[in-house]
From Swiss-Prot:
InterPro entries: Elong-fact-P_C (IPR015365), NA-bd_OB-fold (IPR012340), Rib_uL2_dom2 (IPR014722), Transl_elong_fac_P/YeiP (IPR020599), Transl_elong_KOW-like (IPR013185), Transl_elong_p-like_YeiP (IPR011897), Transl_elong_P/YeiP_cen (IPR001059), Transl_elong_P/YeiP_CS (IPR013852). Disulfide bonds: none annotated. SUPFAM superfamilies: Nucleic acid-binding proteins, Translation proteins SH3-like domain. GO terms for cellular component: cytoplasm. Transmembrane segments: none annotated. It comes from the Bacteria. Belongs to the elongation factor P family. GO terms for molecular function: translation elongation factor activity. SMART domains: EFP, Elong-fact-P_C. It holds the Pfam family Elong-fact-P_C. The lineage of its organism: Bacteria, Pseudomonadati, Pseudomonadota, Gammaproteobacteria, Pseudomonadales. This is Elongation factor P-like protein. GO terms for biological process: peptide biosynthetic process.
Length: 188
């Protein structure tokens, strides 16, 4: 059983008789206390998708739930449901928009390396690769000699994500984006 301080984002834990998927963790160190750090976890019930915000001491023990990651590709959207297809056995996994809202800014039909996270054979979230390739839909015109400077300009990608890119990048270019930092890395 790991301590609360060892739990990471995108893990599943058993808490109060239910299985929760950890979406976000904030660490805080209270001043003037002789205790350790506090970990505020935003978790979602894997059955009801109900949100739970809970705070744990760093020494609190939690049970990890079984979690399976399956490689999949984005297939299509049906209203608020997004369908991903397993690349091995072609099983279709449906995820609600609210469960994967942040990740949708990085997903197109040709995004490779997407993992669907299953808890008790139910899809609960997706895990993205560290970098993705996306196409610039709109940005200011490129400036000749722009590669000689470090100045940047905003660029809107086909998924709706806005990132800062160097001045020599133009509309229609494919770029690599760091998913965690939401930053431009290079041309694709």
């Amino acid at each position: 059983m790991p301590k609360a301080s060892e739990i990471k984002k995108n893990q599943a834990v058993e808490y109060e008789g239910r299985v929760y998927f950890v979406k976000d963790i904030e660490r805080s160190v209270p001043q003037g206390r002789a205790g350790g750090s506090l970990y505020r976890m935003r978790m979602y019930d894997v059955v009801t998708n109900q949100k739970l915000d809970e705070t744990f001491k760093d020494s609190d023990m939690l049970n990890l739930a079984d979690l399976v990651r399956r490689e999949a590709t984005f297939s299509y959207a049906d209203g608020d449901e997004y369908v991903f297809m397993d690349t091995e056995d072609f099983t279709q996994y449906m995820l609600n928009r609210s469960a994967i809202e942040d990740e949708l800014l990085f997903i197109t039909e040709d995004t490779q390396g997407v993992m669907v996270i299953l808890v008790s054979e139910n899809p609960v979230a997706i895990d993205l690769p560290p970098t993705v390739e996306l196409t610039i839909e709109e940005t200011d015109p490129s400036i000749k000699g722009g590669s000689a400077t470090a100045r940047t300009k905003p660029a809107r990608l086909t998924t709706g994500l806005v990132v800062q890119v160097p001045e020599h990048i133009s509309t229609g270019d494919r770029i690599r984006v760091n998913v965690e930092e939401r930053k431009f890395l290079s041309r694709a």
